[in-house]
């Protein structure tokens, strides 16, 4: 190759020529490959990181070993073959390059090494590239590749790096290179007007075209700049070098230097392809990727032809050097920038400035190139220069023509696009016009259709109105025809009679439609009913009964409730006059027994719910797990006031019940309200929830406080009526229809209108139903009690349920709220099924006597909760219990909803269970003095129950009945009775239908014989006669009226008569009468059957019936016995609430004769009156014969004891006759107005005193009598007058009876009458004496010497009031050591402080201010002290964990009366007796309280063996001593009724007989066995010396488990009363329900006795107690733990009261 004079210039030319040759060959190769249609397989390009690593290894080792290749293969992710090929090609490349350009290679190598070292670490992350080169080693292996990369990098354009690059070459090369570079840089900086940036793009960089619309560029203009017509722009280019590359290099080098025009490209073989290869790969890649990131994939039109084929495959080898780029500076640069690429740099100057500067710059570059080329062309001749000039001109001409052609094509393209855009706009306008026209036509059609529909609807409505009018007329005609055979509403019948009389018509059948529609105009003409001829009397002549009808209603309500549920409450039946007399007596045994049994029922309900876990909302509200039935508000209130419900249960007896009643009333909210300083009600969950009991009730177990549970249950409907057959379930169609129709009044709505209003009201979504009208019709038709059909498809609610439309919004909002509450929490599928069943039954049987007897108001839902009685006050708003329930509910709601006004009180009524630092309900709890509650609570605080007035006593009993009626005990009984009554109704109705069908068959035969003598006209005779004939019938004898309805009478009175007998009776009856009776007897018989079924199973209090004015008639009689004075009384409750009385035979006959048999209500009333007519008249005649004082004068005297004066005539509140009306004398009340009444009063009062003495003195204090070691008593008690005296006396200081001759078996009436002290005070003295004598000596303080003891006895003997006795009791408390008392008991010394509790010189001590100064409060405190004294010091037992299932805690969370351990001190019933002598023989025996209902005491769980503490007075034999008392773990609240299996084993039968003897009265058998029993217990006592007592076991167990709560309500005698059921037979052979299937003596009847005996032979002795005597055992048997008052009249308290089974209910 011929070289110029300048050697350095020759080297540069060779380098540039070599690059050009490679580029052209690659393009030719690419074109040829694309023409052949064969696509070369893609080769994997190596990443820069791989190449750098390979280069480093190659520089160290050109022939790497196999280990080196393996390491490289793993590191670079290349195969061994790829590595071998790369090193082979690398060695070949070095060999080839070394031969051709050794000087240049050496100069560039330094630059290459420096550039390689600067390779970024992230090069390996560059995506793999596409390449079509044959050798992978060609990429990056050229000695110029790295030098080009250095120029192509972002920093290579800076002068600093260029200078550094220039210093690497030789001096001759560096001077020429730096000159060229400086020239290019100066030219560019002059164009830009500012220095080049070091971090800017490389010189000659071709930028991507702008995206469409960038910087405001029109989209259409952007497209046509890309020259889409040049097909070669998209041809794939093959960059692979040819084999002839090296051979042709010298020619191209010479051509590129000598002929600059050879670099001018055409449109199909562009310079930009070679120039684009000079761009750094990373820069080009980042440009394209950044565009793709922002705008999606790069369109091919925005990529240059070089990029289109090599954007991912350009190799560094193909990049031209800056020196070569400087030689390509003719006009092609301008053309390329403006027309080919069509790109603009947004960072440069505007278009005009940029293009002119580019032309200027490129012109300088061309001049420089020509100047440099002239040096080489100086040696050529003029011809050569001329040829070159000609060639240049040709090239310029060709370029100009090409540019003109491109411009023409561009204009054509713009014109075409403009035409297309205009056409598109015209097309869119045409479519828009067509759409507007289409919409106008559609709206026009819709308007026409709506107009046609409106016209059709108007025509249809007119037709419907005509059709409805015709249907109404037809329905009226049918109703009139039906009324001729069916009964009519009583008031409507009377209005029809008045209308017929006014129009002169003989019968109501002749009334026209208009008259029947306007019967209301005759309402003012209605006469009073009952008629004035019926002389009604005032029922009572004394106060307070004659002063208030509400008081009379409350009295009758309470009596009816107690009689109806006497079996559930375990009360003996009593008459109404006995009940009234009890209120007027000074102290009544009957009222005491009633209060005790009601309190026990309430406590039992609380215990049941506390024992039964509450699983949540899905529980049935009628099960015993219903938390509301467990009185959560009472539990909440008891905690707030500091009362202990367990103490109520253990110490409830005839002496303490008034104080427990007071505490219960305060807890229930009847007394003054508790609140905090900031006018907030107390809350049990305030801040100390974790410190208190975990199980107040099941709702607290569930994690909620009792108050919130009460509120949520009330919101969710748990306080709703109990299973009413006409109940409205929220969310149903019936519920929605009722609320909508109740606002419409009597006019009603059609089904269509009703459906529309229901949908609009939001009470029910009817769009989900395909046939909503049918659903509404079915729902309304099935319930005729609430809804009435007044026309075809038109319904309304009955008159009592109509509401004011003005309140419509509030009513509907309340209904929607109920629906939401129902959906959120409460679901009861069982209820729904029961409701459906009852509705099915309702189709066949009308269980209610009359329509309006259900609940005459919307408030019926509240009354149904009470369950037992209907309204006893004639007001429509009053239901069931005559407003008493409403009063109770209002008090409860007031307690928990509206806090009372803020008032402070320094001393709040706390009880000893509270710690001295705590206050009621919390630190800030105070009493609101502005609202003291009901007066009887204040009376019980200030005095005893005997000091209450009659009205206060009644109010207290009403409140107690209201609470008990909400409990689960009553609810369960009601549920059982309701189901039994429904089943009986079905059975009776089926039998009646069967008998009726048989009777009709017989009558058909008889009618054939009678047809000849009867005319056919009489067959269809209407039953409704004219008013004249009907009035004539009233004047006849009632017996004649009965003859007209003999078929009905016979059918209803005796359903079990044979059909033949009834056929004979009806044989001579008139055919019209037969037809009349057969048509109307169905509804009457339904009413009669319903009434009879509810008499057998009463679940509500039903009157005999109602008359036309809705006056109610009641017969309050226990039985039809002549001894019952109420059997001859008929109470009338007028509609205005007034109570009157019918007590004569004449008045009864007038009432029966005035009733209209054609009316619904009066027809049923007449049947019921005829049913009781016989007994009523017989007893009334007997009463007339009795000589009575006609009238009594009123004496307003306060209650006092008959023994307070010589003449006890002023014993109670008396009354006088009424001035306005005659007063009945049928109910007599003894008020001490004569000697007979005084004698009766004294007799009853002495009977009460004997009962109190028997029930309390022999059993209290119970623990002291069972476990105490009695010392000598300080005082003795007179058996004649119950007076205390010093023990050294021989005569009683009160009755002056000689003590050694007094019969101790009976208290003398004369002795009781002479004592000046109240009986309660006299009774407390011997109890205190016995308690003091039973306290162990080691339990007393050191100061309690014999002298101090005598002083205490003297003070006790001189005490004459409950307050003085409380001081004496407090003195005894302070004398007992703290360690000898239960940790749960807080003495007055601890609560008030030791300084305040010390006695002064006179002996008075400070007592607890919150304990009332009453006999019952002192007795309750005495019982609590007795239960807390540790009479026997226990020994340490084996520590055995307790059964968690028995943990039933009613402690409040932060209650201070919980001890150090949960069972450190249990009830005193568990205390073991004194240990006796040691004995090697060991056995297990049951120990416990001496009552007939045993507490299930703590069970130490050791394997399957558990021990309990049984009763001490069980006369066991040797076989019993080895019995282990295993019993099952109780189920979670489920009642299990099991038959007691028959025992044929001789030992077992003997054991049962021995157990049964315990509850028998004292007899000779007991006395015979006394010696054997004492010997038995004596032997067992000896074993205690070697063992441990239960008391020590309890304390150690409590110390082991300090964090467990004490079980306050174990399943003891009284708890068994709540969950157990014993049959009425006292021989123990009936059903018995118990949580653990144990009998009342603690034995497991379901276990094998023989196996238990064998297993117990190896058990350790738990211990037994010392028996003090059979007398004490017998006394404690009936009254100790349970304190059930013994009722000798009915023997109900001599046996165990365990509740009643479903059969008994």
UniProtKB/Swiss-Prot annotation:
Phenotypic effect of disruption: No visible phenotype under normal growth conditions, but the double mutant plants rlt-1 and rlt2-1 are small and display early flowering.
Pfam families attached to this UniProt entry: DDT, HARE-HTH, Homeodomain, WHIM1, WSD
GO cellular component, one term: ISWI-type complex
Gene3D superfamilies in alphabetical order: Homeodomain-like (1.10.10.60)
Every DDT domain range: 549-608
Residues of the DNA-binding region: 39-98
Composition-biased stretches (Basic and acidic residues): 1455-1465
UniProt keyword list: DNA-binding, Flowering, Homeobox, Nucleus, Transcription, Transcription regulation
Gene Ontology molecular-function annotations: DNA binding; DNA-binding transcription factor activity
Residue ranges, annotated region (Disordered): 1-53, 118-167, 237-267, 296-322, 352-414, 1028-1053, 1198-1229, 1441-1502, 1561-1635, 1652-1705
GO annotation (BP), single: negative regulation of DNA-templated transcription
Cited PANTHER family: HOMEOBOX-DDT DOMAIN PROTEIN RLT1, HOMEOBOX-DDT DOMAIN PROTEIN RLT2
Name by which UniProt lists this protein: Homeobox-DDT domain protein RLT1
Lineage: Eukaryota, Viridiplantae, Streptophyta, Embryophyta, Tracheophyta
């Amino acid at each position: 190759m011929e070289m110029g004079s300048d050697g350095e210039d020759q080297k540069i030319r060779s380098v540039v020529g070599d690059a050009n040759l490679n580029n052209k060959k690659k393009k030719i190769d690419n074109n040829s490959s694309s023409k052949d249609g064969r696509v070369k397989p893609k080769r994997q390009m190596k990443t820069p990181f791989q190449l750098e690593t390979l280069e480093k290894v190659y520089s160290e080792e050109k022939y790497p070993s196999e280990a080196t290749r393996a390491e490289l293969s793993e590191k670079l992710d290349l195969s061994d073959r790829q590595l071998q090929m790369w090193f082979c090609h690398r060695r070949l490349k070095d060999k080839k390059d070394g031969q051709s350009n050794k000087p240049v290679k050496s100069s560039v190598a330094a630059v290459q090494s420096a550039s390689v070292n600067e390779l970024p670490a992230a090069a390996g992350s560059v995506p793999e590239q596409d390449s079509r080169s044959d050798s992978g080693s060609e990429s990056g292996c050229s000695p110029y590749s790295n030098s080009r990369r250095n120029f192509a990098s972002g920093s290579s354009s800076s002068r600093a790096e260029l200078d550094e690059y220039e210093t690497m070459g030789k001096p001759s090369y560096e001077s020429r290179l730096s000159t060229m570079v400086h020239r290019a840089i100066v030219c560019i900086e002059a164009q830009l007007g500012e220095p080049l940036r070091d971090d800017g793009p490389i010189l000659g960089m071709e930028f991507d075209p702008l995206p469409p619309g960038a910087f405001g560029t029109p989209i259409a203009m952007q497209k046509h700049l890309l020259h889409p017509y040049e097909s070669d722009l998209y041809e794939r280019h093959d960059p692979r070098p040819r084999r002839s590359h090296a051979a042709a290099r010298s020619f191209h080098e010479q051509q590129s230097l000598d002929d600059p025009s050879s670099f001018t490209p055409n449109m199909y073989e562009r310079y930009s392809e070679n120039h684009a290869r000079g761009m750094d790969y990373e820069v080009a890649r980042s440009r394209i990727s950044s565009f793709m990131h922002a705008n999606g994939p790069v369109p091919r039109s925005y990529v240059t032809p070089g990029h289109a084929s090599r954007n991912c495959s350009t190799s560094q080898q193909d990049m031209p050097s800056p020196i070569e780029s400087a030689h390509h500076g003719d006009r092609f640069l301008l053309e390329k920038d403006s027309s080919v690429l069509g790109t603009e740099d947004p960072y440069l100057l505007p278009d005009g400035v940029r293009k002119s500067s580019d032309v200027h710059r490129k012109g300088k570059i061309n001049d420089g190139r020509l100047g440099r080329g002239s040096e080489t062309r100086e040696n050529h001749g003029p011809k050569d220069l001329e040829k070159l000039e000609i060639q240049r001109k040709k090239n310029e001409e060709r370029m100009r023509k090409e540019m003109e052609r491109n411009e023409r094509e561009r204009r054509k393209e713009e014109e075409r696009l403009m035409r297309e855009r205009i056409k598109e706009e015209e097309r869119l306008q045409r479519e828009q016009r067509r759409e507007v026209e289409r919409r106008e036509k559609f709206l026009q059609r819709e308007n026409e259709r709506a107009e046609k529909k409106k016209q059709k609807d108007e025509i249809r409505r007119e037709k419907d109105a005509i059709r409805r009018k015709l249907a109404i007329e037809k329905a009226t005609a049918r109703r009139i025809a039906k009324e001729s055979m069916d009964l009519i509403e009583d008031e409507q019948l009377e209005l029809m009679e008045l209308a017929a009389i006014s129009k002169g018509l003989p019968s109501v059948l002749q009334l026209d439609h208009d008259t029947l529609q306007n019967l209301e105009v005759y309402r003012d003409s209605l006469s009073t009913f009952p008629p004035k001829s019926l002389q009604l009397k005032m029922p009572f002549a004394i106060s307070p009964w004659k002063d208030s009808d509400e008081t009379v209603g409350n009295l009758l309500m309470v009596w009816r409730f107690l009689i109806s549920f006497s079996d559930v409450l375990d009360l003996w039946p009593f008459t109404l006059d006995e009940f009234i007399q009890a209120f007027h007596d000074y102290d009544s045994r009957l009222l005491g027994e009633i209060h005790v049994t009601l309190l026990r029922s309430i406590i039992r309900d609380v215990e049941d719910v506390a024992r039964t876990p509450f699983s949540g909302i899905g529980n049935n509200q009628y099960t015993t797990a219903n938390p509301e039935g467990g009185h959560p508000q009472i539990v909440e209130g008891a905690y707030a006031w500091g009362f202990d419900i367990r103490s109520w249960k253990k110490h409830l007896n005839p002496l303490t019940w008034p104080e427990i009643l007071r505490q219960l009333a305060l807890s229930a909210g009847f007394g003054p309200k508790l609140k905090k300083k900031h006018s907030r009600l107390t809350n049990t969950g305030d801040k100390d929830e974790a410190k208190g009991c975990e199980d107040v009730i099941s709702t607290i177990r569930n994690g909620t406080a009792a108050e919130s549970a009460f509120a949520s249950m009330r919101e969710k409907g748990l306080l709703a009526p109990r299973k009413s057959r006409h109940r409205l379930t929220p969310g149903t169609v019936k519920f929605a229809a009722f609320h909508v129709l109740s606002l419409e009044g009597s006019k009603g709505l059609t089904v269509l209108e009703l459906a529309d209003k229901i949908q609009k009201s939001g009470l029910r979504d009817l769009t989900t139903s395909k046939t909503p009208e049918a659903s509404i019709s079915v729902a309304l038709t099935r319930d005729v009690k609430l809804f009435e059909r007044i026309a075809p498809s038109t319904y309304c609610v009955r008159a009592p349920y109509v509401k004011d439309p003005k309140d419509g919004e509030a009513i509907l909002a309340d209904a929607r709220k109920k629906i939401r509450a129902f959906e959120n929490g409460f679901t009861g599928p069982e209820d729904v099924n029961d409701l459906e069943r009852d509705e099915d039954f309702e189709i066949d049987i009308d269980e209610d006597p009359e329509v309006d007897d259900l609940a005459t108001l919307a408030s019926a839902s509240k009354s149904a909760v009470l369950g037992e009685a209907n309204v006893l006050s004639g007001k429509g708003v009053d239901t069931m219990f005559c407003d008493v329930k409403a009063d109770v509910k209002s008090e409860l709601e007031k307690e928990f909803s509206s806090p009372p006004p803020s008032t402070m009180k320094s001393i709040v009524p706390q009880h000893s269970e509270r710690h001295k630092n705590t206050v009621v309900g919390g630190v800030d709890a105070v009493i609101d003095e502005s609202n003291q509650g009901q007066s009887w609570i204040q009376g019980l605080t200030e005095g005893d129950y005997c000091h209450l007035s009659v009205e206060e006593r009644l109010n207290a009993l009403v409140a107690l009945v209201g609470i008990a009626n909400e409990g689960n005990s009553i609810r369960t009984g009601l549920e059982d009775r309701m189901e039994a009554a429904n089943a009986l109704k079905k059975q009776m109705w089926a039998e009646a239908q069967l008998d009726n069908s048989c009777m009709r068959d017989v009558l058909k035969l008889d009618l054939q014989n009678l047809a000849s003598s009867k005319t056919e006209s009489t067959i269809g005779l209407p039953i409704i006669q004219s008013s004249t004939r009907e009035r004539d019938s009233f004047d006849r004898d009632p017996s004649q009226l009965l003859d007209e309805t003999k078929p009905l009478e016979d059918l209803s009175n005796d359903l079990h008569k044979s059909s033949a007998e009834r056929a004979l009776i009806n044989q001579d009856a008139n055919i019209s009468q037969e037809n009349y009776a057969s048509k109307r007897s169905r509804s009457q018989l339904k009413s009669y059957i319903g009434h009879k079924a509810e008499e057998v199973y009463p679940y509500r209090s039903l009157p005999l019936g109602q008359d036309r004015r809705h006056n109610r008639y009641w017969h309050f009689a226990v039985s039809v016995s002549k001894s019952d004075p109420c059997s001859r009384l008929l109470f009338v409750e007028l509609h205005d609430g007034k109570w009157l009385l019918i007590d004569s035979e004449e008045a009864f006959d007038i009432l029966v004769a005035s009733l209209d048999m054609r009316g619904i209500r009066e027809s049923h009333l007449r049947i019921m009156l005829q049913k009781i007519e016989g007994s009523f008249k017989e007893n009334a005649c007997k009463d007339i014969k009795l000589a009575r004082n006609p009238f009594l004068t009123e004496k307003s005297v306060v209650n006092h004891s008959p023994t307070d004066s010589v003449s006890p005539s002023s014993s109670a509140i008396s009354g006088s006759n009424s001035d306005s009306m005659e007063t009945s004398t049928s109910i007599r009340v003894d008020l001490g107005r004569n000697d007979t009444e005084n004698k009766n009063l004294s007799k009853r009062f002495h009977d009460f005193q004997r009962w109190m003495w028997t029930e309390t003195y022999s059993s209290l204090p119970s623990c002291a009598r069972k476990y105490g070691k009695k010392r000598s008593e300080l005082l003795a008690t007179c058996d004649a007058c119950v007076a205390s005296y010093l023990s050294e006396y021989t005569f009683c200081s009160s009755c002056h009876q000689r003590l050694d001759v007094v019969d101790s078996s009976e208290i003398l009436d004369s002795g009781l009458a002479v004592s000046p002290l109240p009986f309660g005070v006299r009774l407390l003295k011997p109890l205190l004496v016995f308690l003091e004598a039973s306290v162990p000596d080691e339990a007393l303080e050191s100061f309690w010497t014999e002298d101090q003891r005598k002083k205490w006895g003297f003070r006790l003997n001189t005490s004459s009031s409950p307050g003085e006795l409380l001081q004496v009791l407090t003195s005894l408390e302070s004398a007992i050591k703290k360690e000898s008392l239960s940790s749960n008991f807080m003495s007055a010394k601890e609560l008030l402080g030791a300084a305040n509790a010390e006695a002064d010189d006179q002996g008075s001590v400070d007592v607890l201010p919150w304990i009332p100064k009453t006999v019952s409060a002192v007795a309750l405190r005495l019982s609590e002290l007795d239960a807390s004294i540790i009479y026997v010091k226990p020994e340490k037992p084996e520590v055995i964990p307790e059964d968690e299932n028995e943990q039933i805690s009613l402690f409040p969370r932060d209650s201070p009366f919980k001890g150090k351990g949960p069972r450190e001190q249990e009830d005193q019933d568990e205390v073991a007796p004194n240990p006796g002598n040691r004995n090697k023989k060991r056995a297990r025996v049951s120990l416990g309280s001496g009552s007939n209902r045993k507490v299930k005491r703590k069970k130490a769980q050791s394997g399957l063996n558990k021990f309990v503490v049984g009763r001490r007075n069980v006369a066991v034999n040797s076989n019993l001593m080895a019995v282990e008392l295993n019993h099952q773990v109780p189920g979670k609240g489920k009642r299990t009724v099991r038959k007691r299996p028959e025992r044929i084993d001789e030992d077992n039968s003997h054991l049962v007989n021995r157990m049964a003897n315990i509850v028998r009265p004292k007899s000779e058998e007991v006395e015979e066995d006394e010696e054997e029993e004492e010997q038995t217990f004596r032997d067992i006592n000896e074993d205690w010396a070697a063992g441990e007592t239960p008391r020590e076991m309890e304390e150690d167990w409590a110390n082991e488990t300090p964090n467990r709560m004490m079980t306050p309500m174990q399943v003891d005698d009284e708890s068994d009363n709540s969950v157990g059921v014993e049959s009425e037979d006292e021989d123990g052979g009936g059903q018995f329900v118990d949580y653990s299937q144990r009998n009342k003596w603690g034995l497991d009847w379901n276990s094998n006795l023989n196996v238990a005996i064998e297993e117990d032979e190896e058990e350790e002795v738990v211990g037994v107690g010392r028996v003090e005597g059979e007398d004490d055992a017998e006394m404690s048997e009936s009254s100790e733990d349970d304190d059930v008052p013994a009722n000798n009249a009915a023997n109900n308290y001599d046996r165990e009261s365990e509740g009643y089974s479903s059969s008994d209910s």
